[in-house]
Amino acid sequence: MAPYIEGRQRLQELTEDRPAIKEVGYSRTFAGIWDYTPPTFYTAENLQIKSGGRAIIMAGSDNVVRNNTIEVDGRTAVYLYGPRSLVEGNTFIVHMDPRDKAPLPAILKLRDADGSIIRNNRFIVKRSRLFRKKEEEPQAGINLLESRDVVIEGNVFEQIAVPVRKDTASTTTEYGNAVDSR
């Protein structure tokens, strides 16, 4: 089947009214259109990005975010959905705009990211003058949802209350990370 026909059918699937979640035993999993496992091999590399909101959102498996400088006004710079992502050598800077009321603020968010690797990145929070108290809303460097066997190594977290936040379903191996809370 030609690629444009496959893409057209996929777009139609995404726009049809379907339940977004289904019950499977005791846990909830995303239904067919929310399957992040097909390999997409997207790569964002050697970029300088400044954004008012999220700079990168990728869905699919085997994606790479490497050697970028990403600066955003909000609280989340990158959101990745899907397994086996590689995030390495980046500098993430967030300015913590208090108008951004996203729940569980984190510079890097991963969902269903089994087997992902996050290494040798720098996570920096620069608070807006409007931001009143450091304790108002704990900012995480990395937030994991439903993500198992994630390796987090060699990262530096600056002015971040919680370097890694994860739900009960997520598991990590963490080593060589540094927290600078000046």
Regions found by a protein language model. Name each.
Residues 1-37, 50-55, 60, 72-79, ...:
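Extracellular beta-strand/beta-solenoid scaffold signature
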Residues 3, 19, 24, 46-47, ...:
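Consensus "Asn ladder" position of solenoid repeat domains
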Residues 7-11, 15-16, 37-39, 43-44, ...:
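Parallel beta-helix/beta-solenoid
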Residues 48, 53, 61-62, 69, ...:
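Position-specific detector for the leucine-rich repeat
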Residues 71-72, 76, 84-86, 93, ...:
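Short, surface-exposed, polar/charged, turn-prone segments marking secondary-structure boundaries
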Residues 138-139, 150-182:
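Predominantly polar beta-repeat domains that present long G/T/S/D/N-rich surfaces used to bind, process
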